Amino acid sequence: MEPSAEDGGATSSSRAEKGEPPRDPVEQARAICLRLLTGTPRTRRQLAEALRKREIPEEAAEEVLSRFEEVGLINDGAFAQAWVESRHHGRGLARRALARELRTKGVEAALIDVAVSQLDTEQEEETARDLVARKLRATRGLDRDKRLRRLAGMLARKGYSEGMALRVVRQALEEEGEDTEHLGDEGF
C-alpha cells in the first residue's frame, strides 16, 4: 500500500497496526476478548466484566460473547475442569476451595459440580497426606498440639474438611512416633 496524505504518510492504514482501537463497539468487544483470551482462559462472566469496565454497550458485548461461545472460544465447563485439575495438582486445593474459586469467577453451579466431581475422596485424602508430609519436617521441635493446629490449619485453608484434616495429621504424627491418643476432637 502506498503512503498517502490521509494516513499521515504511513505505509499501513489498518487501525490495529497503528494501535488504534476499533471504533465499532462490536469490533472493540471482539478485540478486547481476543486479547484477554490470548494470555489465559477466562469465563464468560470475566470477559463480560472486562467489557463492562471498558464501557462497551451491553448489546455489543452480548453479541460477541455469544458468538465466542458458539465457536468454542469461551467454554465455562472446560475452564472449570482445567481449573480443578490445575489447582488441585499445583496447589493441593480441596473440592470445597476449588468450588469457591470457580464461583468467584462466575462459573454456574452445575458446571462447578461436574468439575469438582473429577476428584474423589481418596484423591483428596492422598493429596492432604502429601501436603502434610511436606510440612511435617518444618514443625519438628514444636509441641504436639501446636503441630496439630498448624498442620490441620494449613489443610483447612486449602479447603479440606476438619474431620479429614485431623485424621490425616494424626496419622502423620503417629507415623512419626508422636503420641496422639489424648489429642482432643475439639477442633483447631
Swiss-Prot record:
Q: Which Gene3D superfamilies match?
A: Winged helix-like DNA-binding domain superfamily/Winged helix DNA-binding domain (1.10.10.10)
Annotated stretches, region: Disordered: 1-28
**Bias (Basic and acidic residues) ranges:** 15-27
Where do the TM regions start and end? Answer: none
- Give the main location: cytoplasm
UniProt key word Lipoprotein: no
According to its UniProt entry, the protein's GO biological process terms are: regulation of DNA repair
Q: Does the keyword Cytoplasm apply?
A: yes
Query: GO terms for CC?
Result: cytoplasm
Print the keywords alphabetically: Cytoplasm
Localization, per the record, is:
Cytoplasm
Q: Quote the Pfam families the UniProt record gives.
A: RecX_HTH1, RecX_HTH2, RecX_HTH3
> Entry's NCBIfam families?
PRK00117.5-1 (NF001061)
Q: Which family does it belong to?
A: Belongs to the RecX family.
Q: What does this protein do?
A: Modulates RecA activity.
The protein in question is named Regulatory protein RecX
* Organism name: Streptomyces coelicolor (strain ATCC BAA-471 / A3(2) / M145)
The major lineage groups are: Bacteria, Bacillati, Actinomycetota, Actinomycetes, Kitasatosporales
Q: Which gene encodes it?
A: recX
